[in-house]
Amino acid sequence: MPTVTPVHRYARYVLDVSRLRVLDAFARLGSVTAAAKELHYTQPTVSHHLARLEAETGAQLVQRAGRGIRLTPAGQLLADRAAEIIGRIDAADAELTAHVGLAAGRVRLATFHSVIGSLVPRAVAALGERHPGLQIGLTDTQPPEALELLRSGKIDVAIIFRYDDTAPEPDDVRLHHLLDDPLYLLSNGDARSLASLRDATWIAGCDRCRSHLLSMCADEGFEPTIGYTSEDMVVIQGLVAAGLGVATSPGLALRAHHLEGIVASELPGAQQHIYAATYGEPPDPPATSALLDALAGAAASVSGGSPVRQTA
């Protein structure tokens, strides 16, 4: 008599990518409401997809938690894999689009303010001349968020900055060095060093910049008094020009915007290291490679020299 081996009900189903996208959004955002908003679904639709995914896998993926729901361990396991699956599918779609031809492809870029105002316009202009049909998607965000978008397959290239004391990026992220961007001390007077401003009110930037500022000041023997925080360099320069505080700024930001009344003095040895980051094994898709080449050219065109007039 033949032996019949019980088969779990999950074996009868193929995971639905649309439902995996719902699970991924719920895992990242933490609520049905937020997931529905991101995916442009109604809340009942999100709940339906989660329920169907449970029925198809035979696993409890979510459980009640107060007035809401949260992932179970099984749900978290599948959500982690869902992010990888979605990233691969989106990457495959982007590669196929690029393979059809750069004349009708699309490449997606995420980066931060100072690069958007300096390198990106030059790179996009050059790319447009070489490949006029290639579309560019642009997202304005800080390095940690840009890398998250990159690893989830939502973008093709992330331009990030690092300091010497920044923790290493994940192993599966490939970094392409673009340039080293000097840091400048901003004040509305003649301030030449961090130590000379130990008693000043400081304006801090993003988390990565704030940590580096604290580290630099600690090396000079003081802890800065931070009175304001902003990731917008226009806002930071406005506060400095009004005499409300002092700050540091990368040179690229000063190339993009330099408010009248601000004195910028280069900090010896202080730099942001600027990289274009890609994800996965080489080679990069043609559209991604074309963007990397354009970014390298733009970086070379702004490297060297000072973005500001140095004080006498």
Stretches with model-predicted labels:
Residues A25-Q43:
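Short helix-boundary/capping micro-motifs
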Residues E54-P73:
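A short LG(V/I)-centered, amphipathic sequence patch enriched
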Residues A104-T166:
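Central regulatory/effector-binding core of bacterial HTH transcription factors
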Residues T141-I155, F161, R208-V263:
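Hydrophobic hinge/microswitch elements
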Residues F161, D199-E220, D284-L292, V302, ...:
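Secondary-structure junction motif
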Residues A167-H177, D181, V234-P283:
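Beta-alpha-beta core module
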Residues P170-G205:
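Flexible hinge/capping segments at coil-to-helix
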Residues L186, D190-S193, I262-T311:
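A late-sequence structural motif
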